[in-house]
Design a protein with these regions (language model features):
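Alpha-helical transmembrane segments and their membrane-interface junctions
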Residues: 39-45, 105-127, 179-203
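Cytosolic-side membrane-entry/anchor segment at the start of a transmembrane helix
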Residues: 66-104, 158-170, 174, 227
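Alpha-helical transmembrane segments
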Residues: 54-67, 122-144, 207-212
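Juxtamembrane inter-helical linkers in multi-pass membrane proteins
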Residues: 150-171, 232-247
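Membrane-water interface of transmembrane alpha-helices
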Residues: 2-3, 68-81, 138-158
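C-terminal transmembrane-bundle signature of multipass membrane proteins
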Residues: 174-256
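N-terminal juxtamembrane cytosolic/stromal segments of multi-pass membrane proteins
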Residues: 1-31, 229-256
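C-terminal halves and exits of single transmembrane alpha-helices
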Residues: 77, 95-121, 252-255
Length: 256
């Protein structure tokens, strides 16, 4: 579909060795797990005090079950990647794990809003439909931005020559503007359907912004997965990383 060449990804390779390096990805994982844990705490408290009977509907039980499975996987992978050598030995797997973390980060706020006990506000059928549409919108945004990112990569947008372009292309800008209108309409419907106060509306706005920001940013993660699995230059061994680290340390010491 796309003829992505390794030599056309010099700029993205630099990004992968800095912000998207195994250490950078582990930092993202740690930040995400802290945020997610704050909201998962309410689920654990409800299960410990009242058991599964606290979640009366089949929908609630399904959502809680999914969140528990995802959270358990996140904990397991985080423990694995806390070991420096494991980050490099399993760095291809780590790219997939980062996408899992991104999904959890983007959706956990709405989990907090729709499950009973996590807020003091009731959720009716219309609100659930609107939340579902917000999620579908984010999925569409992610698909379009991912396709556009791969198209940019095939055209040399992430190279270091005259073809170099910003990650935020015209396609992404149009998608962002369109999603803003789409999300605004759904948020207005949620607000008037439930007669929420302003503070609750802010939670929905924040959740929407986070979800769509992750949907757009995760397109870069998808390209990282592709590059790590296909191109050797995107795969750094532990020994190579140690040599570079020692060289940089020696250079900094020399310049002091």
């Amino acid at each position: 579909m796309w003829n992505i060449k390794e030599e056309d990804l010099d700029q993205f390779r630099i990004t992968c060795r800095n912000r998207l390096s195994p250490e950078g990805a582990t930092g993202f994982m740690m930040g995400t797990i802290i945020f997610v844990s704050l909201l998962m705490f309410f689920i654990f408290v409800a299960l410990v005090t009242d058991g599964w009977d606290y979640y009366s509907t089949f929908f609630d039980k399904i959502i809680v079950s999914i969140e528990l499975v995802l959270y358990s996987l996140q904990i397991i992978f985080l423990i694995l990647y806390l070991f420096p050598k494991a980050r490099y030995k399993f760095q291809k797997l780590q790219t997939l794990v980062v996408i899992l973390y991104a999904f959890q980060l983007g959706t956990i706020t709405f989990t907090a809003l729709v499950l009973p006990g996590m807020t003091d506000y009731s959720i009716d059928r219309m609100t659930l439909i609107c939340v579902g549409l917000l999620f579908i919108g984010a999925v569409i945004v992610h698909i379009v931005t991912t396709i556009d990112t791969f198209k940019q990569a095939s055209e040399g947008a992430f190279s270091m020559d005259e073809r170099s372009q910003s990650f935020f292309s015209e396609t992404k800008e149009r998608m962002i503007k369109g999603s803003m209108v789409y999300n605004l309409v759904l948020l207005i419907i949620i607000y008037f359907d439930n007669d929420y106060d302003f503070d609750t509306l802010i939670l929905y706005v924040v959740g929407t912004i986070v979800m769509h920001a992750v949907a757009i940013g995760a397109a870069e993660f998808q390209l990282l997965v592709y590059c790590r699995f296909k191109f050797k230059s995107f795969h750094m061994t532990w020994e190579e990383n140690e040599r570079i680290r020692k060289r940089n340390k020696k250079f900094k010491t020399k310049n002091k």
